[in-house]
A protein has these predicted regions:
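Hydrophobic ligand-binding cavity/cleft-lining segments
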Residues: 1-39
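Intrinsic-disorder/low-complexity, polar/charged segments enriched in Ser/Thr/Lys/Arg/Asp/Glu/Gln
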Residues: 3-9, 16, 40, 52, ...
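Generic structural detector for well-ordered beta-strands
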Residues: 7-13, 44-46, 56, 71, ...
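Structural motif
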Residues: 13, 75-77, 105-107
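Hydrophobic pocket/interface hotspot
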Residues: 19, 29, 53, 72, ...
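Glycine-rich portal/gate segments that line the openings of hydrophobic small-molecule binding cavities
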Residues: 41-84
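Beta-strand/loop substructures that line and gate deep hydrophobic ligand-binding cavities in soluble
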Residues: 82-133
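Short, highly charged C-terminal tails/helix-capping segments
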Residues: 141-148
Length: 148
């Protein structure tokens, strides 16, 4: 699928296991996934193949929210996560597929994200910007080495 697809690449100064865990832990997701100006609530997260998740983003300025959820289709810890998801709003139809790959590199983890099947009403560039904001927050979560 080449249209309605977002592709992202980032190198993080953290091991793949830690970066991967940030995609599978409800508290971590709520901290880093919402782009600027949004909050996130994770309602359900069963991180296993065939497991489901449900969450919502809320626009902090207006209070309006958007729910979405999906199913984990592939899960190889520290290497690859693939899930499908869909919005609750009928004006945002269809199913998206997101594939995240983690690869060990000399300074940490190379992260690649491909999100396919965006609804036509969501500009790919806007979605890409949102992901970029989220990935800045992800780096702030996973890169610090804080002793106990």
């Amino acid at each position: 699928m080449t249209t309605n697809t977002v592709r992202l690449h980032r190198v993080l100064r953290a091991p793949p296991a830690r970066v991967c865990r940030a995609f599978l832990d409800a508290d971590a997701i709520a901290k880093w996934l919402p782009p600027d100006g949004f909050t996130c609530k994770v309602h359900q997260l069963d991180a296993k193949i065939g497991g489901n998740y449900r969450m919502s983003f809320t626009n902090f300025s207006t209070g309006s929210g958007q729910g979405f959820g999906g199913t984990y289709r592939e899960l190889v810890p520290g290497e690859r996560i693939r899930y499908d998801d869909h919005f609750d709003d009928p004006r945002l139809p269809g199913e998206m597929t997101t594939t995240i790959t983690f690869r060990t590199v000399s300074c940490g983890t190379e992260l690649q994200i491909v999100q396919e099947g965006l609804p036509d009403v969501i500009p790919v560039e806007q979605c890409c910007l949102g992901w970029q904001e989220s990935l800045v927050l992800l780096a702030k979560l996973v890169e610090p080495e804080i002793p106990d």
